[in-house]
């Protein structure tokens, strides 16, 4: 079965989440450990997301810090929320043919699956704020 982009994003989330615990782990090994899929070959878009988020992580984290309310730091965020924000911000800025609204909607779908309703509202607000900043600068 071929994976669609939504499923690839879910698996990219899982790989990135696992790599937070062991940044030296091999992406292929982590990918193969994800349950519920028969694919052994990593989809190219998953590699784009995982490698892109890792490559730009410092910049993405700075941007996330800028989106937080005063008194909050990135260290206070739930780990799933942090991974979802990194993925969304990466897609908004670097992924080809992914409109901002799609990246935000996909982030909200990931939040429904991997986080909480409260987090969904937070992520929606943070990404909405980022989108507004981008639109104001263009």
Swiss-Prot record:
Name of the molecule in the record: Transcription antitermination protein NusB
MF (Gene Ontology): RNA binding
Cross-referenced HAMAP family: NusB (MF_00073)
Family: Belongs to the NusB family.
Role noted for this protein: Involved in transcription antitermination. Required for transcription of ribosomal RNA (rRNA) genes. Binds specifically to the boxA antiterminator sequence of the ribosomal RNA (rrn) operons.
Keyword Transcription: yes
Originating species: Limosilactobacillus reuteri (strain DSM 20016) (Lactobacillus reuteri)
A GO BP entry: transcription antitermination
InterPro entries tied to this protein: NusB-like_sf (IPR035926), NusB_fam (IPR011605), NusB_RsmB_TIM44 (IPR006027)
One GO CC annotation: cytosol
This protein's UniProt keywords: RNA-binding, Transcription, Transcription antitermination, Transcription regulation
Pfam families tied to this protein: NusB (PF01029)
